[in-house]
């Protein structure tokens, strides 16, 4: 009997454990590879295998990416989708959510959990429970000093708890297209369920650089924090990014760098995000899992410097609307006659002039292949043109309904290239053709006025023609009556003359 009880208890315990395991979500484990710096240095660079693409430099980072911010074009790719622990570059997402959900002057009160849930040996600025900072001051502390308690305080200020804030982080990451990311906290301290990839971090960085506040704060070399309700003294905070601030060395200072964030833990090794403007391009560089050499900033910053030099020297940014010929709308044509009626006006449809492509230096714009995709349900955007080169997307722009004065009747064939032909073939056509209509309102007004006058004239003529018909019928009846009277009169005259002759010759001559 006891043996039966033990058996039953074992089964129930096993079932309980199994249900407990199944009830918790599973997360992808970060693959740990025991690699030396030399092993990482000689790992394959995927972008170097792209046809007609400039060869990029070898770097010591296990994963690295360079992306152009406005187009999303990937210029350099090395293991960009591998999952890694991000360390403090996590705070880029924390700052993004703060900028999207807070005003800078909002007051943030530090809770007990925000201050004391972090390891005291980690990055912080020694805030106390109950201390009050503004959102802006917290952002300076997060981006310059990588303050973990400030990250916690911002998270609780926005979502109530750091756990709820982590859910917001994951939702926002998914919206940005991140596929290899899961956040577990707002600061980046080690957690096996807290990971991302170089590509995903570049997507997050691409979004946050749209905020001028991020550029201003992250690009500051230092910031003086005022005295607070619990601190009587000011605090000078320094940016830990060596390309922005001479925090420990001036060797890597670069005036083209406008933002960045550092990260380090023993499991993540060095991580770094850097934003720089080179050759008219905003370049976003992310390196992950870089092992230090013992020399200050090497190879972490030498890798980034080499990648920024490579991108700035080997690529060019080209405006689409200024170079696109297949989709150009000619403003001086009226039914392809080359004449303009009254004056030139804004076309009904035009290419968005803010669209760009990024191509290797020396490559002509015509080498990029456009693909046209129509957009439904948008009052302004009619279609999107996406360009590719060497099998990679290199930029896009929108075809817009201007909503202003409409120009000329112009039916112009648009050739969308090979990809456009394939798209049209799928729709049962032989080639990709789009006919655009431009209308001059003055012409429409003149034509409409002429049509109205013609209609009025026709109505008037119909009215007069009706009166004329009545008069004509009267005349015809009068003529018939007159003819009848004449005929009757003629008959009477004939009879009269006949009687007169008879009278003339019918006298009795013998009576004389």
Residue ranges and their predicted role:
Residues 465-512:
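Cytoplasmic C-terminal tails of single-pass
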Residues 178-179, 193-195, 200, 205-445, ...:
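Domain-terminus/edge residues, biased toward the C-terminal soluble/receptor-binding domains
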Residues 1-12:
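Bacterial N-terminal signal peptides that target proteins for export
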Residues 10, 442-453:
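Hydrophobic H-region at the start of alpha-helical membrane spans
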Residues 450-467:
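Alpha-helical transmembrane segments
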Residues 17-27:
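C-terminal segment of classical bacterial N-terminal signal peptides
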Residues 3, 28-199, 203-217:
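Active-site-adjacent loops and short helices of periplasmic peptidoglycan-processing enzymes
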Residues 26-44, 421-431, 466-479:
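N-terminal hydrophobic targeting segments that direct proteins to the cell envelope
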